[in-house]
Amino acid sequence: MADLTLPTPLVSVSWLRAHLRDPRVRVLDARYALSDPLTGRIAYLGGHMPGAVYADLETDLSGPVQPGGAGGRHPLPDPAALAAWLGSVGVGNDSLVVCYDDPSTGQGFYAARAWWLLRWLGHAGVAVLDGGWTAWLAAGGEVSTDEPSPTPVTFVPDVQADLVATAADVQARGAGTLLIDSRAPGRYRGEVEPIDRKAGHIPGAVNRDWSGALDEAGHWRDAQAQAARLDAQGAPTVTYCGSGVSATPNLLARELAGVPLGPDNRLYAGSWSDWISDDARPVATGEE
């Protein structure tokens, strides 16, 4: 079998159409809606890419919520549990994994969460489909309603601890570390808070709404645009959002801009919902 290279961190619809049925390629459908947890699965059952398996944010891509909220609303899953789930849906260490969601819903960040989690487990062969489900349909991509039954394999995790920042890391960060809040401006400023019990942001954070990583059609902006909006030429960065989900497009965007995931491009996984679980932690409002 000829060598096959997966473009990362983004893959085009044309590449996926050409290689969709290659046995090394696995596709994760990560469509979801925070407002209605069943939306994504219903959409998947109504039509998905042939061979794609559904990756549920709550049950597959997150761990159990802890009493008191420590770890946030979408805690990182246990690495062994995530690895076992990946193996159960046919994703092995040699698999080339493509993740997609539907950016037309305004919540095009679930595929990036899946991408980041695989990278956290040490899996380099993973990419997000540029343009997602919308682009696939626009290009005439095949749609299936069959639920696949992939052969289980073994996925051995190699956890990359330096991709993650904790609340203690955020508190102890030096002046040279940039802290990015990926939520909408109103939530960052503390003017509205539709989900969490406190409004505002972590003191010292700057606001870079995750949606700026995409253009109006749901495609990812180029490396130069990402570097400009994320100040990617300089300080190491810790990025957060409400619960460690919508921050992940900014992490991918920084990688596009030349800063790979690692010590200079980390996710505060618990994010705002973890930060406010301890009332002793300070909260800021307004602009910084």
Give the ranges of each region predicted by the language model.
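Cytosolic catalytic domains that perform sulfur/thiol-centered chemistry
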Residues: 1-288
